[in-house]
Amino acid sequence: MSAPRTLYDKIWDDHVVNRDPDGTCLLYIDRHLVHEVTSPQAFEGLRIAGRPVHSPTRTLAVVDHNVPTTADRLEGIKNEESRIQVEALAQNAKEFGVEYYSERDKRQGIVHIVGPEQGFTLPGMTIVCGDSHTSTHGAFGALAHGIGTSEVEHVLATQTLIQKKAKNMLVRVDGKLPESVTAKDIILAIIGEIGTAGGTGHVIEFAGEAIRSLSMEGRMTVCNMTIEGGARAGLIAPDETTFDYIKDKPRAPKGETLEQAIAYWKTLKSDEGAHYDKVVILDAANLPPIVSWGSSPEDVTSVEGIVPNPDDIEEENKRTSKWRALDYMGLKPGTRITDIAIDRVFIGSCTNGRIEDLRAAAKIVDGRKVASTVSAMIVPGSGLVKEQAEKEGLDKIFLDAGFEWREPGCSMCLAMNDDRLKPGERCASTSNRNFEGRQGYKSRTHLVSPAMAAAAAIAGHFVDVREWQ
């Protein structure tokens, strides 16, 4: 009888083409997502070598990082480097026979939102992209992670990837989530608990009652930020919630094929007694809304809390690092989180740019006005998200409140397009990284949920969203 296996073990074993004595494996890759920033050199490598794309139907190209999100974006991209990258992706996709969603296509959006909503992402698959937040797709019970540009070329050419297997880690979130506490709060709390190196060398499986209670969109938020916890990838075993989400998607299996697929997908769960190299358990019942205060995703606290004092940290290097973070963020120890005033609000990104995220924000915003001291923007994660939001009248709620309503793209998550903070500006952001300069030179980023960001836009400072329900 074979030893019990984890979900990660099962997907890995199913995709090993060759295994060397030192543990190095050649893995078959089911899906390859491509965007404009990490693909130009890869396609050029194919061109020079005279190689075709091995499996065009298993490859999907989407423009997202550099595209403007303003209404006039079809007039062109002003930044020359960004424009060249976008034009190169369009040309490469055409030349190599890869399906491509341009900024003129309503299916266009952030690659990690587009994949799932098209049914390109399915349980049990191996999925890669030249982007660190590819872990998002693990919400479907897929093994998904980012790769470098040379690896992008390797996958384009061979539909395989050379890898060594990571260790297994289980993060179990028990209990029921309190009202107004979200998937974003769960993952920020997890990173606060394990640190940004806590998952290094591991693939994390998320489990427990709180995880199971999440919608697919919530699960994608959790898996999206696995990389911020240091892990290679994050996984959630598929269930009826997963199957219900998938079945109506354009590229999903249909009819009898779907029934056969679901029968297989139901086997994609960890066996009882499977070994994990590391286990972390959290209690969801005690989770509050979370706000980041520093320049690392592990720098988090409750909205009810205060900015911590780095002098309380024993380890010298970490203490020095946290003092640097406070200096960069312009904060002092002991400051109440709810006393921190903000200048900007960004609701969007591959972490929180889906329809449920916009609904949560609209619920807070409805009938209220953005503070006079705040500039706020909503950037739907895809054209289809934008279309659905407009059908529901969410755009009107945001516009009436004083938010900007933008076109889809990565936007202010990262300073690679025109949406960026000015030096010293402080932003309540639903994105995934608060590094120095992430949203612009000397930008100050606080990571929060969509509801928390929306409430901060109205109040002009952080507030406990639980008091607004």
Swiss-Prot record:
Record keyword Amino-acid biosynthesis present: yes
Record field: catalytic activity: (2R,3S)-3-isopropylmalate = (2S)-2-isopropylmalate
Note on cofactor: Binds 1 [4Fe-4S] cluster per subunit.
Listed EC numbers: 4.2.1.33
SUPFAM superfamilies named among the record's database cross-references: Aconitase iron-sulfur domain
Pfam families: Aconitase
Disulfide bonding pattern of the chain: none
Role noted for this protein: Catalyzes the isomerization between 2-isopropylmalate and 3-isopropylmalate, via the formation of 2-isopropylmaleate.
PANTHER family for this protein: 3-ISOPROPYLMALATE DEHYDRATASE (PTHR43822:SF9), HOMOACONITASE, MITOCHONDRIAL-RELATED (PTHR43822)
Protein name, entry field: 3-isopropylmalate dehydratase large subunit
Organism whose genome encodes this protein: Agrobacterium fabrum (strain C58 / ATCC 33970)
Lineage: Bacteria, Pseudomonadati, Pseudomonadota, Alphaproteobacteria, Hyphomicrobiales
Gene: leuC
